[in-house]
Amino acid sequence: MDESALLDLLECPVCLERLDATAKVLPCQHTFCRRCLLGIVGSRGELRCPECRTLVESGVDELPSNILLVRLLDGIKQRPRRTGSVHGTCANGSAVAGVRAQGAGGSQRDPGPTGGQSQRVQAKSTPVRGVPQLPCAKALYNYDGKEPGDLKFSKGDIIILRRQVDENWYHGEMGGVHGFFPTNFVQVIKPLPQPPPQCKALYDFELKDKEADKDCLPFSKDDILTVIRRVDENWAEGMLGDKIGIFPISYVEFNSAARQLIELDKPSEGGGDSSEGPSSSSSGPQANGSQKAPGEKKNSKKRHSFTSLTMSHKPCLAPPPQRHSMEISGPVLISSSNPTAAARIGELSGGLSSSAPSQVHICTTGLIVTPPPSSPVTTATVFTFPPETSYASIPVDALPPPPPPPPQSQSSVVGAAALNAGQRPSPAAGDQSGRQRPTVYVAMFPYSPRKEDELELRKGEMFLVLERCQDGWFKGTSMHTGKIGVFPGNYMSPVSRTVSGSSQPKVPLTLCSQAGRGVTIVSPSSALGSMDLSKPLPVCPNATPSCSLPAAVVTAAHLPTGQHPKVLMHVTSQMTVNQARNAVRTAVSHSQDRPTAAVTPIQSHNPVAYLPSTAVVLQASPVLNSSSGCSSARVGVALGCAAASLTPPNVSAASLDTDAMRPVPMVALPVNAGSTKPLGAASNHGVACRLDKDCKREKKGLLKLLSNKKKLRPSPPSSPTLEAEQSVSMELPQGAVGPEMALSGSAGHNGRIGACPMDSELSMSSSSSNTDAVTHRSSPQDNTAPIAPPPRQPCSSLLSMQHDGRPIVCERYRVVVSYPPQSEAELELKEGDIVFVHKKREDGWFKGTLQRNGRTGLFPGSFVDSI
């Protein structure tokens, strides 16, 4: 190493003057000149290391000298100087003085007619023949200054650089005058030093087992660490005070120099580029190669307290995403205008279910992830339902069992083709070990909040229920306002899904919108004869008026078998995404050859079957009727909107022998007019066998998360079990009379007060004396006390109030180290949290559900321990 380069290394990092024997070394091993240290003590009242902010307890004069520095200086003094380098190794003071004097306007001009020109040539050639002692730049143009505080200079002047304000401005000095000037007016001869690679702690990083984690570097929030190098994808090595160790990258925020160091991953060698960082990345044309080489050596070795750094000329970039295969569990609707986020979500893999992979469809207003049936709960803050999306017509028979087919026509098909036909039947009604899934509910009545965490309900407003608590309260998100809170469950009604008959083969369907809200299923059968499906259908003469059901509540018409060719299922553009999904599920389930464990509409002996007289769609639109035999096939059907106001949330409005934990609207069930045996008895055996088989296959090594609730009826009658996904399809037990409905009157004695409003239209009487008819109270006069929201109890995110027979495949883990999320797809872990892990990925990341808030996402497996 030649003498000039060695001298260039021996400079104070603060004032950039050459160090001498009076320089002091701090306890953190950083060395500074005595003048700078005294200045820091005088201005701050205390001495902290300018590099790492370590507090120094002793005085400046008590600090030791740097022995290595003293020896180097002695060696340089004793070493004979080469003849050709006399000009380049001139004393620090004289070189700087010469530059300043020349910049001031020629107080030391050489004699002769070309004195001014020779002076500038000498100043310009100084960095080439020797090494300048201060960062400097040469003026390319005249600059007169536009505002007070600007530095004026002429073309060819040498300006000492003090700092870079931003990518467009420098602060510099010329002739003792300080000021600002634009970067594009100068050419940097010697760049400013690279700022130290540092990072700021965003969280506390503590060590549980100091012996096992002895290589880690603990720190507290807001500490400033010096970054040394990147160890691997998630860890970096750094220094805090006199300690060196590794720390998680996600716990800190890097400055520009540290970000470049982390990106480079290892020091680069050689040098086509100069080693200055962002400070000189926009400083105009660079000097030639002979000028770059000394700068490289200087910056790569200047901070002798940590690893050498060499930076390339490029703007500071954020660290690239380290995980590309983000998985989003569902069901969740994710709306993002950020293409990066959309692309990351789009890379999600097959989810948790082995039965069917997830489908992702990008529509005009957002990205909709349609999960497989066994995906766990995921909370989402924004839900987008495309308002004017046109849904393609999809042949029912074109939807085979899993895997689901891709969309068949327009790119705007959202979720209609995404649902697969391979939905498994749920276990028997008594076996309740399901999980909660975000479900769309509609508010049946207005409700004014009485506490801060409650949401205001407006009639007809849609909510995504994320959690159903045991006390009957729901926790969810308003799809209109995006607010999250709790609200009484008995004020809500689910946006239901239709049920298919397990005893019927493939049946053509047509879904037509009623005012863009309700959906009616009818058969385009020739047996309907003169019935015009495009016109409102008349109601049976004896039909009693009923309430308007929520959006997408479906009433099922009996469909005769063996009479219809394949037809298309049409989903109107006014339907919400969930309605479209539900419609496809209905059509798909018709195409299955195996029983679906759903309520079975028994075929009528009449050539034309009817909707029951009490089945009503939104806005009381009339339902199918026929001129003959109307009274012979009527069945009294419980309406969820009426029952919701009359029953506690843990009692089903119409199926009191099941464990339905929320009020649900009922699907109309036409039955054989001459048959009095329980519904679905003929297919009970086959359904039960298939359920047992599915349950045994799914329950291997599974953890049941639910506590079963006692049934209100000791011995439910024989009936098909509920479809796991179809919360609306409650069976109608034979002769079910609802004395338990009176229980709802006692719900107002504690907890929150506020009567559930009722409408006289909700009143319904028994529709016939048929033994299969269901009678229940629905008139407000039948109750002695108004119905109030149920008393609030602590919600448990693990207790599912939904009747779903499939438990989550999961293991319990406890968070041992807090983890801050790096993206929306990741979970925020706090120490002590319980996480239910559903999937362990090969890259060491887990996917699971956080017990604290019910959110599902990704997190590193090293932050949790199995319980």
Curated annotation (Swiss-Prot):
The lineage of its organism: Eukaryota, Metazoa, Chordata, Craniata, Vertebrata. Its EC number is 2.3.2.27. Keywords: Cell projection, Cytoplasm, Golgi apparatus, Metal-binding, Repeat, SH3 domain, Transferase, Ubl conjugation, Ubl conjugation pathway, Zinc, Zinc-finger. Has E3 ubiquitin-protein ligase activity. In the absence of an external substrate, it can catalyze self-ubiquitination. Acts as a scaffold protein that contributes to the effective activation of the JNK signaling pathway. Residues 116-125, 770-784 have a biased composition (Polar residues). It catalyses: S-ubiquitinyl-[E2 ubiquitin-conjugating enzyme]-L-cysteine + [acceptor protein]-L-lysine = [E2 ubiquitin-conjugating enzyme]-L-cysteine + N(6)-ubiquitinyl-[acceptor protein]-L-lysine. Residues 132-191, 194-257, 436-497, 808-867 form the SH3 domain. It is found in: Cytoplasm, Perinuclear region; Cell projection, Lamellipodium; Golgi apparatus, trans-Golgi network. One of its GO terms (biological process) is regulation of CD8-positive, alpha-beta T cell proliferation. Belongs to the SH3RF family. It holds the Pfam family SH3_1. PANTHER family: CAP, ISOFORM AC (PTHR14167:SF116), SH3 DOMAIN-CONTAINING (PTHR14167). This is E3 ubiquitin-protein ligase SH3RF1. It comes from Danio rerio. The RING finger domain is required for ubiquitin ligase activity and autoubiquitination. SMART domains: RING, SH3. The gene is sh3rf1. InterPro entries: Endophilin_SH3RF, SH3-like_dom_sf, SH3_domain, SH3RF1/SH3RF3_SH3_4, SH3RF1_SH3_2, Znf-RING_euk, Znf_RING, Znf_RING/FYVE/PHD. It comes from the Eukaryota. GO terms for molecular function: MAP-kinase scaffold activity; ubiquitin protein ligase activity; zinc ion binding.
